[in-house]
Amino acid sequence: MFFLLASLLLAFPSTGTELPHLKFNGFLRFNYNYSDWKEGSKKRGGDFGYDLFKLGVAGSYKKILLDVDFRFYAKPSGGAMLKSGWIGYKFNARHQLQAGLTRVPFGIQPYGAHNYFFQIAYYLGLEDDSDMGIKYLYAGDRWEYAFAFFKNSEEELFGSDSETAGDRYSYDVAGRNKEVNQFNGQAFYQWGDETRQKIGASAEFGMLYNLDTEKNGTHYAFAVHHELYWKGLSLKTQISTYAMYPKNKPGESRDIVTMTAFNAPYEVAAKANIYSVSAGYTIPFSKGIVNSIQFYNDFGWMQKWDKSFHDSFQNVTGCLITAGPVLCYVDYAQGLHQPWFGPDWNAFGAGTGSNAWHARFNISLGYYF
């Protein structure tokens, strides 16, 4: 579809009339994965295979904007999916409006970590999340802020009793509850030249519609965050809290909710605090094929409000090697009660499975264009 659209635009004769501008981007990535809790993987010495192909489009026509990020994962991980896609209006260099599947303004932007796996907040739907709605953004010299209303998360089925589909990139509430009517606000203040700093705060409030009781529960989240950049150093810190109050039918727990992405739903504690610290240092190279290497360590802690639950932790140590259009992430990811880094897939819930730290060694190799 993207190539057809580009062909049609190129077919227009040159009449002096302003035409839409389109620019394509994307990447192809492969992954090597060695997980210490998977006996088969250990005996094989790990596995190397296809990760994903991304095709993106950035477009403009006068003051109208277009941005599309479409992902092609393996079929078991959700297959083809729209990560984000919106139509916007640029009032001027500082004010912009976006409508569609647009990024939720919450937490450090665009990411709170340096590694391939993001921060722990991503797996709880509070980092790199996009939902269906409308968003206003302002970007000044010192201040930046955003306000948004999201009608719901990515909706695909449109049935009166349809659960949230699992073939999505970002984590959303699923099962018998659905995210609806969500408001977000975010503000940043930045200063400094040689040493740049940025502080910010984020707030979120919305409803959880239960398909069984047909009643609306509520959910909220707040965060404060700070970023520091000095020469090659990058330091990102964030404190977040969230709570979900679903209106489930009698007999169903309200202390755990279901969230889903990549066709793999799991249980998550309904209330928790999140603490994260991410540090990186970049070394540039002026000769040879390698442009730079960034070393980093990113730590995240999910502190669950329910004292009978076990907290979740993750720590990722690694480096990003950049050689022109080729990016290579080399990560040693450790987790305690973290489903992506351990044997218990519902560890973000009660966390009553393995009480040992587990590790995943991962290499992501990609060509970006």
Q: What do the predicted segments below correspond to?
A:
Residues 8-25, 37-39, 289, 324, ...:
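Outer-membrane beta-barrel biogenesis signature
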Residues 17-35, 42-156, 188-192, 276, ...:
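Outer membrane beta-barrel
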Residues 18-20, 62-63, 93, 141-142, ...:
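Short coil turns and loop connectors of transmembrane beta-barrels in diderm outer membranes
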Residues 22-28, 66-68, 97-99, 145-147, ...:
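Transmembrane beta-strands of outer-membrane beta-barrel proteins
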Residues 31-39, 71-77, 106-108, 113, ...:
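Sequence/structural signature of outer-membrane beta-barrel proteins
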Residues 189-305, 313, 367:
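Detector for outer-membrane/organellar transmembrane beta-barrel domains
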Residues 277-279, 355-369:
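Outer-membrane beta-barrel "beta-signal"
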